[in-house]
Each structure stands twice: as C-alpha cells, then as structure tokens.
Amino acid sequence: MKGFTATLFLWTLIFPSCSGGGGGKAWPTHVVCSDSGLEVLYQSCDPLQDFGFSVEKCSKQLKSNINIRFGIILREDIKELFLDLALMSQGSSVLNFSYPICEAALPKFSFCGRRKGEQIYYAGPVNNPEFTIPQGEYQVLLELYTEKRSTVACANATIMCS
C-alpha cells in the first residue's frame, strides 16, 4: 500500500493538469495542523507543482525545536537554496525574513546539492525561536528559490489562533 501511495503522490506532483492542479485551477488547501485553538493551512502558489508539508505537534507555544516533514520533486538543481518569508496581519507587514538554507560552502541539510528530478524528503527538527503565537489571523508567504531565483516551492499560508 505504501508503494501505491508514493506512486499516486509522485503522479500528482509530476502531472498536475491530470490531477486537477494545472490548467488554471488552484492547488488544494492543505492542513498543516489543527489543534487547541490553532489552525495552520497552506496552498501552493507555484502553478506547476504542489508539495507536502506537516508539523508533528501543533501548539500555540512554538518550541525552539519543532519536527517537520517536507516533500517535493525538484524542477531545478539545488546548488544554493534560500527561504523568504513574509508575515502579514490585517493587511500590514509584520515580518520579512530571508534565510540561506543551502550555501555552496556551507550545506546545512542532506538535500543540499540535489539535482533536477530528484526528490527531497526531510523529516526532522527545525531550529526556531521559542514564542507564543498571539491571537489573530495571519497570512504568510513562503518562497524557496535557487541562486538563479528559480522557484523550488511557494506557499500561501494562513495561521488562525484563538
């Protein structure tokens, strides 16, 4: 059954127009987590490809190490990889953040250096500042891109905390 699920997942990523993701249709909205007054949703904003992302434990109190899962098939080689994050609340910018994930001289993850067509699957801890998510609704734009500014993954996320 795992083989069938993996095949179906790969088919969806490789042929989005056959699975409802291409041809001008939006990708589905995915639930990252939903628990105890916190709900995090995302939708791929890359017209060509969706990806998988989840968080192990959903909590308003963000810990310094959270375990995530991320999976995607690469359309570009990764020599260098960067993350841009923009956080908005009520139409106003709250935070803009850029972070180098893979640098030529300093690869931080095992997937740094992967080639076009290969799969990235990361399951493990991510270091971040520990804080409590304030009550409210937030929009987050996340973009992973290469040194050539080619998009690897893009997501519009919504965080709702009550």
Swiss-Prot record:
Which SMART domains does UniProt cross-reference here? ML
Q: Which residues are glycosylated?
A: 96, 156
* Record has Cytoplasm as a keyword: no
| Single GO cellular component term | extracellular region
Q: Name one Pfam family in it.
A: E1_DerP2_DerF2
Signal peptide range in chain numbering = 1-20
Q: Recount the UniProt induction comment for this entry.
A: In monocytes, down-regulated by the cell-wall fraction of Mycobacterium bovis (BCG-CWS).
Q: In which tissues is it expressed?
A: Highly expressed in B-cells, monocytes and tonsil.
Q: What InterPro entries does the record tag this protein with?
A: Ig_E-set, LY86, ML_dom
Q: What GO biological process terms does the UniProt entry carry, in alphabetical order?
A: inflammatory response; innate immune response; lipopolysaccharide-mediated signaling pathway; positive regulation of lipopolysaccharide-mediated signaling pathway
Task: State the disulfide connectivity.
Answer: 33-58, 45-154, 102-112
Q: Where in the cell is it found?
A: Secreted, Extracellular space
Instruction: Tell me which UniProt keywords the record has, alphabetically.
Output: Disulfide bond, Glycoprotein, Immunity, Inflammatory response, Innate immunity, Secreted, Signal
Subunit text:
M-shaped tetramer of two CD180-LY86 heterodimers.
Protein task = May cooperate with CD180 and TLR4 to mediate the innate immune response to bacterial lipopolysaccharide (LPS) and cytokine production. Important for efficient CD180 cell surface expression.
Q: What is this protein called?
A: Lymphocyte antigen 86
**Gene source species:** Homo sapiens (Human)
